[in-house]
């Protein structure tokens, strides 16, 4: 039986086409994935992301624990209300999950994890927390909305209480604030400006309806996927997993090597890989002919082992097919993609196609 978010009946009332997403009954779209995509790029859209896993790490040992758990270093967070993106790796350097950690207070950190990896992630974090002065609290009583797009913040501010407006209007990128049991973060998964809002379950339907009345477009998983792909944002379980490392996934920037005595989990394995040199890298592909690149398709590189498409789709913004691919480091400027037995040329570039709504 699939799980349902508190907004399930609201989605149905909005005309959503529902699909099973890792055990959750979630909206794929509300009639037009294309219109939803463009709404986020040009105006404002909202996503129910209440299926995500929210874990609060409480106690005086929170920072010390997270410095051991994550590849990125939370010591970069210099004050309360800051957020940090990181990978969480196993001892072999394989990515268990990617996540955002928010410092709400010196003894209070919030981690938002992927839903598909919830059970494994929570068990891993709990096991690794032994010996640290921390307690873990999974917050299933909370719901989460992502409001994204160039007009997302303005439209959100128009429906908030004055106390919320005062706090939210001063947020900059990767900052967060708590107000009256509501949590606001200027983060997202679309490549656009916006907010992720976490509220008690009993408030989320009213929040959704208020945003709807303010002209924010409901958006489903389909648009969320094409938006994040255009922005070069990876999807766990598809673009990376425990068999891949941050260094070969375009996420080397999330690995902080100094100070050496931090000894985060997987540091030794990643240091060895760095010293030896990676054999594979993540690139962006733009198809040069008709066709759609999809996950799992082969990438043919002359004189090299095959690469593979990890994520691919049609880009509504660029109006052509784009993809993320893991390929040998020797890969040049052009490759061939095997699409249903036909070899179609594709241009190789950076694994990001759109920045703030504009082609990179």
From Swiss-Prot:
This is Aminomethyltransferase. Its EC number is 2.1.2.10. It comes from the Bacteria. One of its GO terms (biological process) is glycine decarboxylation via glycine cleavage system. HAMAP family: GcvT (MF_00259). It holds the Pfam family GCV_T. It comes from Legionella pneumophila (strain Paris). InterPro entries: GCS_T (IPR006223), GCS_T_bac (IPR022903), GCST_C (IPR013977), GCV_T_N (IPR006222), GcvT/YgfZ/DmdA (IPR028896), GcvT/YgfZ_C (IPR029043), TrmE/GcvT_dom1 (IPR027266). It catalyses: N(6)-[(R)-S(8)-aminomethyldihydrolipoyl]-L-lysyl-[protein] + (6S)-5,6,7,8-tetrahydrofolate = N(6)-[(R)-dihydrolipoyl]-L-lysyl-[protein] + (6R)-5,10-methylene-5,6,7,8-tetrahydrofolate + NH4(+). NCBIfam families: gcvT (TIGR00528), PRK00389.1 (NF001567). Disulfide bonds: none annotated. The glycine cleavage system catalyzes the degradation of glycine. Belongs to the GcvT family. GO terms for cellular component: cytosol; glycine cleavage complex. The glycine cleavage system is composed of four proteins: P, T, L and H. Keywords: Aminotransferase, Transferase. GO terms for molecular function: aminomethyltransferase activity; transaminase activity. The gene is gcvT.
């Amino acid at each position: 039986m699939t799980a349902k978010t508190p907004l399930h009946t609201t989605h149905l009332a909005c005309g959503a086409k529902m699909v099973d997403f890792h055990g959750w009954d979630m909206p794929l779209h509300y009639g037009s994935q294309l219109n939803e995509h463009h709404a986020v790029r040009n105006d404002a859209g909202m996503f129910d992301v209440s299926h995500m896993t929210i874990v609060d790490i409480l106690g005086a040992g929170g920072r010390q624990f997270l410095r051991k758990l994550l590849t990125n270093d939370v010591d970069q967070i210099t004050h309360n209300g800051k957020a940090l993106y990181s990978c969480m790796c196993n001892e072999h350097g394989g990515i268990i999950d990617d996540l955002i950690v928010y410092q709400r207070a010196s003894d209070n950190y919030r981690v938002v994890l992927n839903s598909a990896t919830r059970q494994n992630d929570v068990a891993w974090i709990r096991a690794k927390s032994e010996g640290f002065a921390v307690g873990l609290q999974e917050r299933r009583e909370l719901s989460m909305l992502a409001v994204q797009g160039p007009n997302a913040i303005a439209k959100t501010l128009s429906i908030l209480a004055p106390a919320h407006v005062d706090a939210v209007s001063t947020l900059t990128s990767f900052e967060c604030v708590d107000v009256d049991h509501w949590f606001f973060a200027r983060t997202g998964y679309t490549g656009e400006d916006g907010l992720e809002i976490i509220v008690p379950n009993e408030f989320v339907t009213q929040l959704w309806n208020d945003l709807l009345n303010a002209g924010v477009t409901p958006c489903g998983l389909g648009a969320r996927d094409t938006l994040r792909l255009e922005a070069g944002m990876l999807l766990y379980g598809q673009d990376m997993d425990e068999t891949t490392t941050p260094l070969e996934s375009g996420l080397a920037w999330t690995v902080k090597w100094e100070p050496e005595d931090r000894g985060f989990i997987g540091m030794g394995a990643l240091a060895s890989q760095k010293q030896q040199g990676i054999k594979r890298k993540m690139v962006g592909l733009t198809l040069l002919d008709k066709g759609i690149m999809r996950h799992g398709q082969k990438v043919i590189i002359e004189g090299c082992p095959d690469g593979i498409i990890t994520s691919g789709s049609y880009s509504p913004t660029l109006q052509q097919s784009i993809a993320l691919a893991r390929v040998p480091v020797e890969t040049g400027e052009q490759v061939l993609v095997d699409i249903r037995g036909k070899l179609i040329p594709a241009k190789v570039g950076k694994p990001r196609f759109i920045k703030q709504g504009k082609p990179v």
